[in-house]
Amino acid sequence: MAKRTQKVGITRKYGTRYGASLRKVVKKFEITQHAKYGCPFCGKVAVKRAAVGIWKCKPCKKIIAGGAWELTTPPAVTAKTTMNRLKKLQEEQAAAAALEKKN
């Protein structure tokens, strides 16, 4: 038997309502919202969305605050990399100051 939801996928529940372009946008959000993500604590791919912005890992029982539809949002990734870069820079400056103090 042929697959009946080749294009519509998860948005088949909306039928012909709301227009094709809006259903495509909703499809993108719903796929990311229902997907499983990797846990930053235990490393297993078992993090699922519990509520808006709340994500739970089944094996390690951790609850993570994240984005509404995705576990990590692009602004959160940017902020995290900036903080890591500043932390590394601060450690390098502290090490250089300690080395200068020694000499």
From Swiss-Prot:
UniProt GO MF annotations: structural constituent of ribosome
A Gene Ontology term for the protein's cellular component: ribonucleoprotein complex
GO biological process, one term: translation
Pfam annotation, one family: Ribosomal_L37ae
Source organism, top-level taxon: Eukaryota
Gene3D superfamilies: 2.20.25.30
Protein keywords: Ribonucleoprotein, Ribosomal protein
Family recorded in the similarity comment: Belongs to the eukaryotic ribosomal protein eL43 family.
Protein name (Swiss-Prot/TrEMBL): Large ribosomal subunit protein eL43
Species per Swiss-Prot/TrEMBL record: Tetrahymena thermophila (strain SB210)
